[in-house]
Amino acid sequence: MSAVPLRNAKVAASGVRSVSVLGATGSIGDSTMDLLRASPERYQVEALTANTNVAGLAKLAREFNARFVAVADPARLSELRAALAGTGIACGAGDSAIVEAAERPADWVMAAVAGAAGLKPTLAAVDRGAHVALANKECLVCAGEFFMDRAAKAGATILPADSEHNALFQALASGNRDELTKVIITASGGPFRTWAAADIEQATLAQALKHPNWSMGQKITIDSASMMNKGLEVIEASWLFALSPDEIDVVVHPQSIIHGMVEFSDRSVVAQLGSPDMRTPIAHCLGWPDRIVGRAAPLDLAKIGTLTFEAPDYARFPGLKLAYEALRAGNGATTVYNAANEVAVAAFIAQRIRFGAIARLVEETMSSWIRAGNQAPLSCADDAIAVDHSARNMAAALLPQIAAKAS
């Protein structure tokens, strides 16, 4: 049985829902807290976590009267306790405290801890059988098969919080799995959609951070510019909805109004539309199986006027093609894809490589890892973390060579 409910059975959510937000001070966390703020009568905050932002975490804890808060940096525990002195709010720090936050008895958990660090706390929430709004990519990209198996066995409900996957989740409710022919994930095309390949190669950090539609964190904005984020989303969709690579298409849609579509066997295509605002998919997750009042601007199609679509250009944006290759290779290759991309993006931000070298480093790392015969099924979180570490080391070792080729 899938942990993602493809048919949205209408079981009314009654009473006050207890919620925990892992990654409360990040961009996804900000959107989540904004929605909670708008409906205080519906939600009780159980636990909140942050990476290092003690001031922001303490402010939210006081505002929402959280019962437990945790900061990932152990050195910040005394600072957190001082900020919450006299409140009676329990405090923790370090990786174990983040896991403890996930283990606390909340009905609904937003899993928005970035990176591989989010895997273990998200699994802790899954193991309780909670409703988990999944915003952490690594759970699926690095550990998709066993993550979804574990969620199904625990009776957890996985609610996709990413805009594209949430769109597919909503559209898939219009039919049965055996009636599906393919899903279509939309991509804005990013800031370099119309740029020539030579110009993309030389793009600066400031240019890569100028996304035309979405307001996001630095890493995901750069991933959008390279279309690596769309590659990650293809991988995620495969595990979330049990799809083969051939059942997942990507189309460039510059207006970012249609977020995802599903084609069924009768050739009907069901699409989900909305303003480009992360509060819309998060609101869907927060209210599911019901709907709550959203905070995004209403969609005005007459004002938008035109919706356009283009095929993705794999030559100018090779990162998307590499995602399909990693998905077909299996046995940890998607973990390598993600890890190498993170190393490459960090190097680009540090001005150690050109923008165009991001995909080349990912490709070379994947090739080297496969040539070394490292492929093996991943059966637990520690397996995924080990492959992640190995791939990061391999990418770091290849970095000078890639940088030299581009200079």
Swiss-Prot record:
Pfam families reported in the protein's UniProt record: DXP_redisom_C, DXP_reductoisom, DXPR_C
Keyword hit for Metal-binding: yes
Lineage runs: Bacteria, Pseudomonadati, Pseudomonadota, Alphaproteobacteria, Hyphomicrobiales
Reactions that this protein is recorded to catalyse? 2-C-methyl-D-erythritol 4-phosphate + NADP(+) = 1-deoxy-D-xylulose 5-phosphate + NADPH + H(+)
Q: What is its biological role? A: Catalyzes the NADPH-dependent rearrangement and reduction of 1-deoxy-D-xylulose-5-phosphate (DXP) to 2-C-methyl-D-erythritol 4-phosphate (MEP).
The name on file for this protein is 1-deoxy-D-xylulose 5-phosphate reductoisomerase
Tell me the route in metabolism or biology where this protein functions.
Isoprenoid biosynthesis; isopentenyl diphosphate biosynthesis via DXP pathway; isopentenyl diphosphate from 1-deoxy-D-xylulose 5-phosphate: step 1/6
Residues binding 1-deoxy-D-xylulose 5-phosphate: 137, 163-164, 188, 211, 224, 229-230, 233
